[in-house]
Regions:
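Hydrophobic, aromatic-enriched interface-forming segments
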Residues: 119-121
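Conserved G/P- and acidic residue-centered "switch" motifs that form tight phosphate/ATP-binding loops
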Residues: 116
Length: 234
């Protein structure tokens, strides 16, 4: 019998109340599109609920790649800022858990893809900072038009960098965020921008695969980012 060598891809999860059947209870969950894209790319999705940070290294040792998913604001104290009046509630234990996962992944040189909050977490962990309320800079809510509604922004990409080498020079992307990168973290290079100047993607060229995007590729039909992550595990 041939062994199954499909790579295991960890997916960080939301913690929120959820309802199913007769139950309404706290749950660890993630939109199924994340898992669908990983599976289609040839990987096996592994959900990673919030855990003890001292378990992160053991978890990472069993994975072949990591996706840092979207979610709530990161605690401003983690990048040396006071909370903005428009900052939204953070989950300190999720910040701690995912920081530990990311640092263990970096130590192991595991391929990492950050999505929305995931890009912001990578930036903060590498010493960068965030704009806490993008409408103050962008002059509107085009990046997050309404609850439950994705905005669409046109972005310009550097085709000599990731993810532009995968997606091309210009593309419309779905987004839902009110924060964004301010100062880039150590080693990070911006590689995509919205028309209003918002950094929409960044990567660390010296790493095997360390890429973050501010938009939500899981709701697009183009699987290129997930395919590239899974390919990088080989």
């Amino acid at each position: 019998m041939m062994s199954d060598v499909r790579p295991l891809i960890g997916l960080t999860a939301y913690r929120t109340h959820a309802a199913w059947g007769v139950w309404h209870t706290p749950a660890a969950l993630l939109p199924h599109a994340y898992a669908d894209h990983v599976t289609a790319a040839g990987g096996v999705p592994v959900l990673l609920p919030i855990g003890a940070d001292d378990a992160a290294q053991a978890v990472i040792s069993r994975l072949d790649g990591l996706i840092l998913s979207g979610g709530p604001d990161i605690e401003p104290v983690r990048y040396g800022a006071a909370p903005d009046p428009f900052a939204e509630r953070s989950q300190a234990d999720r910040d701690t858990w995912e920081t530990a996962l990311l640092m263990a992944a970096l130590q192991a040189d595991l391929p990492v893809l950050g999505i929305c909050r995931g890009l912001q977490l990578i930036n903060v962990c590498l010493g960068g900072t965030l704009h806490q309320h993008l409408p103050d800079l962008a002059g509107g809510e085009r990046h997050r038009p309404a609850p439950g509604v994705y905005g669409t922004v046109r972005i310009r990409l550097d085709t000599d960098a990731l993810p532009g080498s995968l997606l091309g020079e210009g593309v419309d992307v779905p987004c839902h965020h009110h924060q964004a990168i301010d100062r880039l973290g150590s080693g990070m290079v911006a590689s995509a921008w919205a028309q209003d100047g918002t950094i929409e993607a960044a990567w660390v060229p010296r790493r095997r695969f360390l890429v973050g995007v501010q938009w939500h590729p899981e709701v697009r039909d183009d699987p290129a980012l997930f395919t590239a992550l899974v390919k990088a595990t080989g």
